[in-house]
C-alpha cells in the first residue's frame, strides 16, 4: 500500500524526505507510454508500478499529502526538446519545492510552469467540447533552451 511504501522508505515531511520519496518513486516505477490514461488515479498507477510523467507526479503528490505536506500537481515544460511534462511540488516553511520523480531530479530554473492544481484535471494542456460528430488528434512538441 501507499502507507507501507512511505514507511518502508522512512519518509519524513521535509524537503529532504520528499527528495528521498521522489527517488523512491523513480526506482519503484517503470516509465511505460500507453500503460495509463488521463483518468488513471494515483492509486491505480501505484498498484501497476508503471505509467508516464503524469502518473509519477500524481503518485508523488498523493504520497506527499499522505506524509502530511500540502502538495500540488504541476504541468509544464522541461529544458530541452519534447512534449509537456508533469511533476509535483510541496509547500514547506513558506516555499514551494519542486520534485520530478520521472527524471529523478529537483525542479530548477530549466522547468517552465504552465499550470498548477490538485491533479491533471485542474491543468490539462487543452480543454473543450465537441458538438456533433467530431474527432481530434493533438501533437505537442516544444523546445526550451537558454538564450
What does each of the following model-derived ranges do?
Residues 23, 55-134:
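Hydrophobic/aromatic-rich core segments of domains that either
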Residues 1-51, 59, 120, 131-147:
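Secondary-structure boundary elements
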Amino acid at each position: 500500500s501507499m502507507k507501507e511504501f512511505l514507511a518502508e522508505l522512512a519518509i519524513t515531511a521535509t524537503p529532504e524526505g520528499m527528495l528521498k520519496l521522489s527517488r523512491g518513486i523513480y526506482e519503484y516505477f517503470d516509465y511505460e507510454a500507453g500503460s495509463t490514461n488521463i483518468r488513471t488515479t494515483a492509486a491505480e498507477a501505484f498498484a501497476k508500478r508503471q505509467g508516464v510523467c503524469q502518473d509519477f507526479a500524481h503518485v508523488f503528490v498523493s504520497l506527499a499529502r499522505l506524509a502530511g505536506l500540502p502538495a500540488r500537481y504541476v504541468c509544464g515544460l522541461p529544458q530541452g526538446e519534447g512534449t509537456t511534462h508533469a511533476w509535483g511540488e510541496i509547500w514547506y516553511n513558506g516555499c514551494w519545492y519542486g520534485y520530478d520523480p520521472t527524471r529523478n531530479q529537483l525542479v530548477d530554473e530549466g522547468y517552465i510552469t504552465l499550470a498548477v492544481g490538485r491533479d491533471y484535471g485542474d491543468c490539462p494542456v487543452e480543454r473543450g467540447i465537441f458538438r456533433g460528430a467530431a474527432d481530434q488528434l493533438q501533437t505537442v512538441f516544444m523546445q526550451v533552451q537558454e538564450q
